[in-house]
Regions:
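Glycine-rich flexible loops
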Residues: 2-308
């Protein structure tokens, strides 16, 4: 078979294709999922099995994907939503279906073989268990950060945000910067806001920042859930970024903005002999941008003393 002819998995979906046209048989949500994985790998954010992605499907997505789901009797067993022995009930997610990257899977392989590297899971009516209904052909389980993703969705839904995507990437500039800057949200937010004008537009609420914690641990899931209640982007010190969005573009764009600006700040500081760059966006300019775009800036991140 020629490389550009593609193939089909056991459920009838095309993969291994060289042209987007060959993917017309894919549900749109899976095609978008695959593209984000490819874009993130192209940016250099996903070494080995680093990073993970999930998508909370809409009812239409489920209808489009349902013909490919495993028959009821062939679906995986119900498994508790748990990490390291700590279990969770998330009733806001009851009955949901999510596309999730697999544990130990390389995101670079998702576009060429989605059914082996990605799964669709269903949450039970109590929001306390999940089962596999498609994918992860050949064995495997959802990402080790599954609980962090699910609790992130729960936090955003509680904030009345129609969150559809949770994306975690190992962004090199952010990780490098976290070796130099203490894990303080105000410090990080001002540093990035003042380095590039676009930042306050993308995250006017500021950044959440978590200190180093064991990946996949209940502690990291708890801290991330708490921060995602009020932030769409959270820095994991010495680890990477996790971001949420109502679309693939929104989540990817947030990560891209933070990572690019971290690189700009590092370059400017290096060019200035390691000192803080002398010309940065002022608080008055930040306010002017937010006024122009009708955004509510997080007053706690400003130094100009003007009341909210």
């Amino acid at each position: 078979m020629d490389a550009d002819e593609g193939a089909c998995d056991a459920r009838g979906f095309a993969y291994g294709t060289a042209a987007d046209e060959a993917r017309e048989g894919l549900p749109a949500c899976l095609a978008g999922f695959m593209r984000l994985c490819a874009d993130g790998f192209a940016q250099g954010w996903h070494e080995a099995n680093g990073g993970n992605l999930s998508y909370r499907m809409t009812p239409r997505d489920v209808d489009d994907f349902a013909p490919a789901f495993l028959p009821e009797g062939a679906r995986g067993p119900w498994r508790p939503i748990e990490t390291r022995g700590v279990t969770y009930a998330l009733p806001r997610l009851a009955g949901s279906h999510l596309i999730v990257t697999g544990s130990g899977k390389f995101l670079r392989n998702v576009p060429t073989d989605p059914s082996a590297n990605v799964g669709v899971i269903q949450i039970d009516p109590a929001g306390a268990a999940w089962r596999l209904v498609w994918g992860l052909v050949g064995g495997g389980s959802p990402s080790s950060e599954l609980v962090t993703h699910l609790r992130g969705y729960d936090a955003r839904l509680a904030a009345e945000d129609d969150c559809r995507v949770v994306y975690h990437a190992h962004c090199p500039n952010v990780v490098a910067l976290s070796t130099l800057i203490r894990p303080d949200a105000r410090t990080w937010t001002r540093m990035l806001w003042r380095s590039m004008t676009e930042c306050v537009i993308v995250f006017p609420e500021g950044l959440g920042v978590a200190p180093w914690m064991v990946p996949g641990s209940p502690e990291l899931a708890d801290a991330t859930r708490d921060l995602l209640r009020t932030h769409r982007v959270v820095v994991w010190s010495l680890h990477g970024i996790i971001a949420v969005g109502t679309s693939f573009d929104e989540a990817f764009g947030a990560v891209h903005t933070v990572e690019k600006t971290a690189g700009l700040y590092l370059a400017a500081r290096a060019a200035n002999g390691g000192a803080e760059p002398p010309r940065m966006v002022t608080d008055a300019q930040l306010r002017a941008v937010c006024d122009r775009y009708a955004l509510t800036i997080n007053e706690d991140m400003l130094d100009d003393g003007r009341p909210a």
